[in-house]
Amino acid sequence: ILMKRKLLRVPCYLKELLAMLLCKLLGAVCRAFIPSYRGIWLVGERGTDARDNGYWFYRYLRTQHPELRTYYVITADSPDAAKIAALGGAVQRGSFRHYLLYYCADYLVGTHVQPCAPDLIVHYHLASKGIRARGKQAFLQHGVIMSEMQWMHRENLYLNLFVCGAKPEY
């Protein structure tokens, strides 16, 4: 059964690898020749909502630092899409633009591991093989997990910043 599940994921992994290669290459070209593809902050939560620390951080960036190139990853049919549209910089989750910005971004900020990834599960597994986005990754933890920290020490967990809610967590 486990092998069958893994085999069912193969097309998904292949699609992500192809998109990754294309967008990494195109992203490098865009960053080299188009200034608007540099200094990108990509923020998100699950990609379907804007209600947690990711939204409030994004709102802060858009209102207090409008000079930054900030984008928020969200689905068009999300009940929270209007909030992001009002702030500007909405990026449709899973779109070509999402992939391109993901691989161009200098900062990937989110409330989940593999922040802003087009496919969280696939990108988590690809990261375990050393294949990941170029941007620095920040995890805006929601809630207090203090004693549930084992998962934070996995080899494929690449975080440059872990924002926590309580002193014992760091």
What annotation goes with each model-predicted range?
Residues 1-40, 47:
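Membrane-proximal basic amphipathic "stem/tether" segments
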